[in-house]
């Protein structure tokens, strides 16, 4: 759990539950654990690295100098690169599933438009996708036994990708309540950790039994928990995924086919929510959905919690948060804080080069340099990067209780009830983390997609104020700086107290909020990286009010 100065800290920024120290090296027995039936697996595992080599001839002298500089400062950061291994799996027969929705069938549904012309009912390329659905017996698992549940896989038959999902109906009025897609970050962390550790209907106790969660987000919404990208959680593939844009089309296909199978949900308001690296995912996924004018997805808003969206702005706030300017005592001494100040200029210069080119050759060294120079000093203290108030517990993920979740989901009876097809569940897959970093995805400017979203839907950026890794200072700063049509009015808006309004704790201050036009920012008091985990009551309070339209036009 300690950082070596010669390692690349790729697990350091933006995982909902990724370990704060992750050495870049080949997993033991990696080749042995690959799925032997994939003939092109060896090639696919090294795809991001091969793509980097293909671009070698395009290197300018300046970029070559940057790589030389990073190699000299952090000698060993690029040693022993290995890309993701496939997960062992056994596909269940079609007879196991209650429904199989063929994308090719949906693709071939034509309707007549207002001009009397024939057009497809929904847009997008769906012919390669199928959706498998199984009704989950809640009584067999003891999780929200009175709530209808479905689980299954989205299959991309063309690219051998299989994404697992688990759907819970609203506890309140599923016929009218909104539907929410929840995404954890990483990249490479399962959204089932969000389900059982944060905002789902149950947590898992020491006895590996479900414990009812009265603050679950399915109190007033139906929720889909999705394991993506592939090879995360119960999802699997013989190939690797290494960039956010590739996952966006998968998510669009899943939602389109799901709402086709269950049209009773398709007319209801739909929202996408997530945290951490979902600051990359959500702008991309929402943009993909909105790009299809003919769709059955009634997208109304997005919510990003403690996200990484604009690294150029957000990395500036690691020193202030670690050194006592974020509302909590300093974790680092003055000498270390000054060294972080000295490194900031070079870091921002590298990130700007990444923004300008969006090439892996500029984005990868920016990630290496900035993570080592600005996150490394904090990590070496052993303090929890997801909560400045706590030490990192004796766990690879800083929270020992997460082991209960993995133990529960690895039980044969649970996997059978859910229709899981892999041989084991892991909360986070750090090979995926490497893939995304070496594709350059980590530092790319996903905030540039947000102005387009704001033209059509409301956007909420919320942040627990005790988080270091995607802290509230940086999230407030990038939303303040964002160039969009309502920028001036938003920038002039002051933070106001956020209080509980509708229960016995009415009047209790839970944070601060500023909102103008379609953009809203919230600071949540006492919340770490995972606000629903640290502040469940406050989490459900702001979530219900946001879904209810309080801060939206």
UniProtKB/Swiss-Prot annotation:
Residue positions the entry lists as glycosylated: 220, 518
Localization annotation: Vacuole
An individual GO BP term: proteolysis
A Pfam family it matches: Peptidase_S10
Catalytic reaction annotation: Release of a C-terminal amino acid with broad specificity
The EC number(s) this enzyme carries: 3.4.16.5
Cleaved signal peptide residues: 1-17
Propeptide intervals in chain numbering: 18-134
Gene3D superfamilies, A to Z: 1.10.287.410, alpha/beta hydrolase
Keywords: Carboxypeptidase, Disulfide bond, Glycoprotein, Hydrolase, Protease, Signal, Vacuole, Zymogen
Major localization listed first in the record, in broad terms: other
GO MF annotation: an example: serine-type carboxypeptidase activity
Active site residues of this protein: 276, 467, 529
InterPro entries attached to this UniProt entry: AB_hydrolase_fold, Peptidase_S10, Propeptide_carboxypepY, Ser_caboxypep_ser_AS
Disulfide links within the chain: 189-428, 323-337, 347-370, 354-363, 392-398
Family stated for the protein in its record: Belongs to the peptidase S10 family.
Chain's role: Vacuolar carboxypeptidase involved in degradation of small peptides. Digests preferentially peptides containing an aliphatic or hydrophobic residue in P1' position, as well as methionine, leucine or phenylalanine in P1 position of ester substrate.
Protein name per the record: Carboxypeptidase Y homolog A
Gene coding for it: cpyA
